C-alpha cells in the first residue's frame, strides 16, 4: 500500500506524492510529463552504452580467443605431418592425372604443352639412364636368349648346307647294309673300307672288301717295331 508524504522535488511543495515500494528502497514517482522526459533520456543514454558494451564484449571475446589459441599453440605445437602427407598425396594424384591427360592428347594427335613435353623428356632420359645402369650391372636375359637363338640358327644353317651338298664319293645310308640294303639301325657293322653292313655281310669275303689287310698289318708291325741302327764307334789306340 502506497504511503503519502510531501515531495518538494516534484515542484509541488504543498502536495503529497505517492511512494511506490521498490526492492531495496523507495522513491517518489515523478509526474507524467517528467516520466516521458526521463524515459527518452534513459533510452538515449542506454543506446550508446549498449553499443559500446557490445563492442567491448566482442573485443574481449576476440582477445580471449586469441589468448586461448595462443595457449593451446604453446601447449601443443601444430602437427604438419598429416598436412604434408595430404599435400603430397594430392600432388602425386595431380601429376598422375596430368600424365594421363598428356597420354590421351598424344594418342589423339594433339601436341602437349612445352612444360609437359619437357617433363616427359626428363622422365624418358632418367629411364634410359637407369636402364643403362641396370644393363651394365646385370646383363639382360633377352640378350642371352638372342645370342642362343642366333647360334642355334647358325648351326641349323650349317647342317642344312652340309646335307644339301654331299661329298663326291657318296656313301650309302648308315642305317642300311651296303650289300643287301636291309635296315640295320644301331646294330650295323662298320668295315674298314668305310661301309656299313648287316650281320651276314660284315666279313670282308662276304661283301668283297677292297681293304688291304696285309699291307696295313705290315705298316702296323713296322711302326710298333722300329729298326734300331747302331753307329760304329772307332777306337783309337
Curated annotation (Swiss-Prot):
It comes from the Eukaryota. Zn(2+) 2 binds at residues 191, 193, 207, 209. Zn(2+) 1 binds at residues 177, 180, 198, 201. A zinc finger (AN1-type) spans 171-217. It holds the Pfam family zf-AN1. GO terms for molecular function: zinc ion binding. Residues 1-31 are annotated as: Disordered. Induction: By cold, dehydration and salt stress. PROSITE patterns: ZF_AN1 (PS51039). The keyword Zinc-finger applies. Keywords: Metal-binding, Stress response, Zinc, Zinc-finger. InterPro entries: AN1-like_Znf (IPR035896), AN1_A20_ZnFinger (IPR050652), Znf_AN1 (IPR000058). May be involved in environmental stress response. This is Zinc finger AN1 domain-containing stress-associated protein 14. It comes from Oryza sativa subsp. japonica.
Amino acid at each position: 500500500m502506497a504511503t503519502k508524504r510531501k515531495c518538494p522535488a516534484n515542484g509541488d511543495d504543498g502536495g503529497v506524492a505517492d511512494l511506490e515500494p521498490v526492492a531495496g528502497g523507495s522513491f517518489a514517482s515523478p509526474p507524467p510529463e517528467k516520466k516521458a522526459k526521463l524515459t527518452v533520456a534513459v533510452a538515449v543514454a542506454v543506446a550508446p552504452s549498449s553499443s559500446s558494451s557490445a563492442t567491448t564484449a566482442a573485443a574481449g571475446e576476440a582477445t580471449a580467443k586469441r589468448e586461448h589459441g595462443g595457449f593451446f599453440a604453446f601447449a601443443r605445437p601444430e602437427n604438419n605431418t598429416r598436412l604434408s602427407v595430404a599435400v603430397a598425396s594430392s600432388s602425386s594424384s595431380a601429376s598422375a592425372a596430368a600424365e594421363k591427360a598428356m597420354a590421351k592428347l598424344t594418342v589423339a594427335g594433339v601436341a602437349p604443352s612445352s612444360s609437359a613435353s619437357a617433363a616427359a623428356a626428363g622422365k624418358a632420359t632418367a629411364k634410359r639412364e637407369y636402364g643403362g645402369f641396370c644393363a651394365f650391372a646385370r646383363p639382360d636375359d633377352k640378350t642371352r636368349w638372342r645370342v642362343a637363338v642366333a647360334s642355334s640358327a647358325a648351326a641349323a644353317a650349317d647342317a642344312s648346307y652340309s646335307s644339301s651338298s654331299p661329298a663326291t664319293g657318296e656313301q650309302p645310308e648308315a642305317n642300311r647294309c651296303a650289300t643287301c640294303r636291309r635296315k640295320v639301325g644301331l646294330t650295323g657293322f662298320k668295315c674298314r673300307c668305310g661301309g656299313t653292313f648287316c650281320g651276314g655281310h660284315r666279313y670282308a669275303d662276304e661283301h668283297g672288301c677292297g681293304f688291304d689287310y696285309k699291307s696295313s698289318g705290315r705298316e702296323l708291325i713296322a711302326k710298333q717295331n722300329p729298326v734300331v741302327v747302331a753307329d760304329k764307334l772307332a777306337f783309337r789306340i
